[in-house]
Swiss-Prot record:
The organism's place on the tree of life at top rank: Eukaryota
Organism: Homo sapiens (Human)
Protein name per the record: Cyclin-D-binding Myb-like transcription factor 1
Region (Required for DNA-binding): 87-458
DNA-binding region: 306-329
Interaction with CCND2: annotated segments: 1-237
Gene3D superfamilies found in the cross-reference section: Homeodomain-like
Key word GTP-binding present: no
Record note on modification: Phosphorylated by the cyclin-D2/CDK4, cyclin-D3/CDK4 and cyclin-D2/CDK6 complexes and to a lesser extent by the cyclin-D1/CDK4 complex.
Region (Disordered): 414-435, 738-760
Domain HTH myb-type: 268-333
Length: 760
């Protein structure tokens, strides 16, 4: 494997052979990527290595295209100290002009949120004076300021919201309360006197700011929607009657006090709507320059009282005046240039160069200075919000990860200019292009322990797949239902699901493969030789291939087996920590040999398995950088025990003892077979975890294959499930799947946009 390390928490995998995850003495997870030493060896010299090979193919011996991306799944034990552990993975496979692009990108980002650990109420006894002060008087504020205290203001970052929600969950759990609204809206001040001070731990904000944030989050009246004309009229009447008694006005309208206050502030009887007239624009410019003592053509973005401006303009609200000036008129008068795609890329790079941990730390005034195509600092920030929205889960990842993802997108576009040309400015796919792009992002969600199914807490798998499919004129369109039989130990296809999870049903051994829609696929694991998947959906070139490995065979066989596939894949192998010595190579990784197959909680005995050897001897092996269709057709019709690939790779790099210091903790394969414990990933309640907790990782990879290399005890390899999405398998000319581009329409000015699946 060859890797490029940008930072300590990111590894971009270029050529994958095998990956090993271990844990050091401090509990940190280490991703070991042995160097591929056989890259330059001609594979033709060693087409038939003397290992027993297991060919993975469908029951009709259907040959799978080289471009088929494959995803391997493995259970990874995490201790209770890893509650903030997050894994984000991104894979992009590109095919243009019927040829596989060699620049296939796989990015693995393993994040340990150290900030959460440092400020956790359980691990930090020192409480910030700021987070324990209400700031009810100016004297309180001045007192803390004179003592050198500083605090954050403005928009809340994702990290701050995560800390706040984590604190609230801990508070509720410690007191046996199910719903936070009981405390916020029903309890008296005496009953909840310690609530806000407790949940403010780790936040460098005054209590009043925390209080207002919590009210906005939990008050449903803040999310009622747009005011109707009838509500506006009633609001005007209530304002005349009750003045600034916002609580009374809000109660009468069924809205929060802050909502009616904001609406009244922007409400004006004489306001025009729609397009501005030339007279209005001229009047706005004159008023702004008059109130700020500036000359026409000067850039004015700060120090403007928009309430005073609106009063002088007379026909527009303060919000309308502010938006018109900052987003258009000031830029037009100062002779600014148009915003281009290069400007968007430059914005990403400039923000990355700032090296800030939070986007709220960005000084937009300095960033916009001297940039002729930037209309105002506020407009530039709005443009940034538009750019980051192209990462579908931008709200769920940290700011540094978001920046790295956007930089990776920039690099992909730079290396593949045709992709940039094929994308329209609005981000809508160009149906005339013959390029197909698949993008998958995977997250790990913890689940509440369900003792009725398993004795160990489980983490379920959720795979949101962002796919835009533009059918060509001759693309097939069938709507027939289909029933697919999955033979254990083989590969089969069924319709791709935008997102799915396994939901236990009332029948033992039966799970419902739930999609985001109302449809579902019943998946039954029984003693019969087959598993039947029924899909009431049209046949599609977008497919998933499932391959199951039984843990029974992993433990009870001693045959040397090299698993070779001509589909790209990665296996992450977990290593028992008590067996890691101070100096160890990959060939010496072992686990406790006392674990027997009986330890598993009723594994399906019908599933055949690929077996991993107690010891594998390595001859001189080679790699062919690319193998053509002739190699595929040569082996595609052979049975399941014959060679499918003509390449072998040997990894020999020693892993230093500093990379492999392990924390003493037990390894229990009995809890590694977790199929029967999978639950809905929508439940993400934090629970006390043990070292036997399971988290499922999915690792997409570029072209390569699995090789059980070096000397690895069979029990150190956990049961696998392989999900392959041969999206480009037989329909490269019939489907066009691309992600969204940076070219999105300019968003409306918004003050509360607090928002990674990179759709490329």
């Amino acid at each position: 494997m060859s890797t490029v390390e940008e930072d300590s928490d990111t590894v971009t995998v270029e050529t994958v052979n095998s990956v090993t995850l271990t844990q050091d003495t401090e509990g940190n997870l280490i991703l070991h990527c042995p160097q591929n030493e056989a890259d330059e060896i001609d594979s033709e010299d060693s087409i038939e290595p003397p290992h027993k090979r297991l060919c993975l193919s469908s029951e009709d011996d259907q040959s799978i295209d080289d471009s088929t991306p494959c995803i391997s799944v493995v259970a990874l034990p995490l201790s209770e100290n890893d509650q903030s552990f997050e894994v984000t993975m991104t894979a992009t496979t590109e095919v243009a002009d019927d040829e596989v692009t060699e620049g296939t990108v796989t990015q693995i980002q393993i994040l340990q949120n150290e900030q959460l650990d440092e400020i956790s109420p359980l691990g930090n006894e020192e409480v910030s004076a700021v987070s324990q002060a209400w700031f009810t008087t100016k004297e309180d504020k001045d007192s803390l300021t004179n003592k050198g205290h500083k605090w954050k203001q403005g928009m809340w970052s994702k990290e701050e919201i995560d800390i706040l929600m984590n604190n609230i969950e801990r508070y509720l759990k410690a007191r046996g309360i199910k719903d936070a609204t009981e405390i916020i809206f029903e309890m008296s001040k005496d009953e909840r006197k310690d609530f806000y001070r407790t949940i403010a731990w780790g936040l460098n904000r005054p209590l009043f700011a925390v209080y207002r944030r919590v009210l906005r989050m939990y008050d449903d009246r803040n999310h009622v929607g747009k005011y109707t004309p009838e509500e506006i009229e009633k609001l005007k009447e209530l304002r005349i009657k009750h003045g600034n008694d916002w609580a009374t006005i809000g109660a009468a309208l069924g809205r929060s006090a802050s909502s009616v206050k904001d609406r009244c502030r922007l409400m004006k009887d004489t306001c025009n709507t729609g397009k501005w007239t030339e007279e209005e624009e001229k009047r706005l410019a004159e008023v702004v320059h008059e109130l700020t003592s500036t000359e026409p053509g000067d850039i004015v973005t700060q120090g403007v009282s928009w309430a005073a401006v609106a009063e002088r303009v007379g026909t527009r609200s303060e919000k309308q005046c502010r938006s018109k000036w900052l987003n258009y008129l000031n830029w037009k008068q100062s002779g600014g240039t148009e915003w281009t795609k290069e400007d968007e890329i430059n914005l990403i790079l400039r923000i990355a160069e700032l090296d800030v941990a939070d986007e709220n730390d960005i000084n937009w005034d300095l960033l916009a200075e001297g940039w002729s195509s930037v209309r105002s600092p506020q407009w530039l920030r709005s443009k940034w919000w538009t750019i980051k929205r192209q990462i579908a889960n931008h709200k769920d990842v940290s700011f540094p990860v978001l920046i790295k993802g956007l930089k990776q997108l920039h690099e992909n576009q730079k290396n593949n200019p045709t992709l940039l040309e094929n994308k329209s400015g609005s981000g809508v796919p160009n149906s005339n292009t013959n390029s197909s792009v698949q993008h998958v992002q995977i997250r790990v969600a913890r689940l509440e322990d369900n003792t009725a199914i398993s004795s160990s807490p489980m983490a379920a798998l959720q795979i949101p797949v962002q796919i835009t499919h533009v059918s060509s004129a001759d693309s097939p369109a069938t709507v027939d239902s289909e029933t697919i039989t999955l033979n254990s130990g083989t590969l089969q296809t069924f319709e791709i699901l935008p997102s799915f999870h396994l939901q236990p049903t009332g029948t033992p051994g039966t799970y419902l493969l739930q999609t985001s829609s109302s449809q579902g696929l019943p998946l039954t694991l029984t003693a019969s030789p087959t598993v039947t998947l029924t899909a009431a959906a049209p046949a599609s070139p977008e497919q998933i291939i499932v391959h199951a490995l039984s843990p029974e065979h992993l433990l009870n066989t001693s045959d040397n087996v090299t698993v070779q596939c001509h589909t790209p894949r990665v296996i992450i192998q977990t290593v028992a920590t008590e067996d890691i010595t101070s100096s160890i190579s990959q060939a010496e990784l072992t686990v406790d040999s006392d674990i027997q197959s009986s330890d598993f909680p009723e594994p399906p005995d019908a599933l055949e398995a690929d077996t991993f050897p107690d010891e594998i001897h390595h001859p001189k092996m080679t790699v062919e950088p690319s193998f053509n269709d002739a190699h595929v057709s040569k082996f595609s019709d052979q049975n399941s025990t014959e060679l499918m690939n003509s390449v072998m790779v040997r990894t020999e790099e020693e892993i230093s003892d500093t990379d492999l210091k392990q924390e003493e903790s037990p390894s229990d394969l009995a809890s590694a077979y977790v199929t029967e414990g999978l639950e809905s990933p929508t439940i993400e309640e934090q629970v006390d975890q043990t070292i036997d907790d399971e988290t499922i990782l999915i690792v997409p990879s570029p072209h390569g294959f699995i090789q059980a290399s070096d000397v690895i005890d069979t029990e150190s390899v956990l049961p696998l499930t392989t999900l392959t999405d041969p999206i480009l398998q037989h329909h490269q000319e019939e489907s066009n799947i691309i992600g969204s581009s940076l070219g999105s329409p300019v968003s409306e000015d918004s003050k509360d946009v607090e928002d990674l699946v990179n759709c490329h």
